[in-house]
């Protein structure tokens, strides 16, 4: 399958069926295309707006035959509701130094990621990732991309978020943090800080990837309101749709 984009045809491919990582007993398929140098930033913008996610040099979205549980979501940063819980988390982490200067992978980031994966996702797909694979994760297919770093008062890296800058917002690709700092809710703080960064940059949205209402791992994203959900009719306010959501603790972005 191809689709016209600018002056060229963009080829799309379909993966084979595989077990769903979010809903037991279900199977997933994905449609994907590769990002080429040159038109990459514009393609990333257009397809993210259409519900795709970037992973290294690939843009993909679910194309499951009998399930549409994965919903692309984005926060309306301009109207974000800073409820008491969010204000407390922001205050708890206000001593952190935030930098958006890192555009390449570092061993310091990788060491932190390895500790995070060992603590929270020891049996996941990313377990045992090598430094070379991490470099590919950060740098391959990068489209106006940076690693937002969060350091304590001693300069120690405590959390990081791989972030794409789009025309209409920030897309949070993956986040990780020091497991010993979990009581500070660093995952939630990185989302809140992305909202702050988007506001400062005049960008209306923060893209969080896929929200899966039936998955306790992925349902937490509905806590960040106002949230918009991509539907067959376009982006719609989550609050106006007939969902009854579970709330769960923070996680990384998918």
Swiss-Prot record:
Q: Which UniProt keywords apply?
A: Acyltransferase, Cytoplasm, Transferase
Leading EC class: transferase
Query: Does the keyword field hold Acyltransferase?
Result: yes
Query: Which subcellular locations apply to this protein?
Result: Cytoplasm
Question: Which reaction is recorded as catalysed by this protein?
Answer: N-terminal L-glutamyl-[protein] + L-leucyl-tRNA(Leu) = N-terminal L-leucyl-L-glutamyl-[protein] + tRNA(Leu) + H(+); N-terminal L-aspartyl-[protein] + L-leucyl-tRNA(Leu) = N-terminal L-leucyl-L-aspartyl-[protein] + tRNA(Leu) + H(+)
Q: One of this protein's Pfam families, by short name?
A: ATE_N
Q: Name one GO molecular function term.
A: leucyl-tRNA--protein transferase activity
Q: Does the keyword Transferase apply?
A: yes
What are the EC numbers? 2.3.2.29
InterPro entries hit by this protein? Acyl_CoA_acyltransferase, Asp_Glu_LeuTrfase, N-end_Aminoacyl_Trfase, N-end_Aminoacyl_Trfase_C, N-end_Aminoacyl_Trfase_N
Q: Which GO terms describe its biological process?
A: ubiquitin-dependent protein catabolic process via the N-end rule pathway
Question: Where's it mainly located?
Answer: cytoplasm
> What's one GO-annotated cellular component?
cytoplasm
Q: Which family does it belong to?
A: Belongs to the R-transferase family. Bpt subfamily.
What is the protein's known function? Functions in the N-end rule pathway of protein degradation where it conjugates Leu from its aminoacyl-tRNA to the N-termini of proteins containing an N-terminal aspartate or glutamate.
Q: NCBIfam families per the record?
A: PRK01305.1-4 (NF002343)
Protein name in the entry: Aspartate/glutamate leucyltransferase
Organism, scientific name = Maricaulis maris (strain MCS10) (Caulobacter maris)
């Amino acid at each position: 399958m191809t689709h016209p984009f600018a002056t060229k045809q963009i080829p799309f491919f379909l993966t084979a069926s595989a077990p769903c990582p979010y809903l037991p007993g279900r199977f997933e398929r994905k449609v994907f295309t590769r990002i080429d140098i040159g038109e990459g930033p514009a393609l990333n913008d257009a397809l993210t707006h259409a519900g795709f996610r970037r992973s290294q040099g690939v843009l993909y979205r679910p194309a499951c035959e009998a399930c549409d549980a994965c919903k692309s979501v984005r926060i309306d940063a301009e109207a974000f509701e800073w409820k008491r819980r969010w204000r407390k988390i922001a205050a708890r982490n206000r001593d952190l130094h935030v930098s958006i200067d890192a555009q390449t992978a570092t061993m310091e980031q990788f060491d932190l990621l390895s500790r995070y994966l060992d603590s929270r996702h020891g049996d996941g797909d990313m377990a045992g990732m090598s430094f070379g694979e991490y470099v590919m994760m950060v740098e391959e297919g990068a489209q106006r991309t940076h690693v937002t770093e969060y350091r304590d008062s001693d300069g120690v890296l405590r959390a990081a978020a791989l972030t794409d800058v789009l025309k209409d917002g920030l897309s949070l690709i993956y986040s990780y943090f020091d497991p010993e700092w979990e009581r500070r809710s660093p995952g939630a703080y990185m989302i809140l800080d992305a909202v702050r960064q988007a506001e400062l940059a005049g960008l209306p949205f923060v893209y969080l990837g896929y929200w899966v209402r039936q998955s306790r791992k992925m349902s937490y994203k509905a806590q960040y309101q106002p949230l918009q959900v991509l539907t067959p009719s376009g982006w719609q306010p989550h609050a106006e749709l007939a969902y009854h959501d579970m709330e769960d603790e923070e996680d990384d972005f998918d």
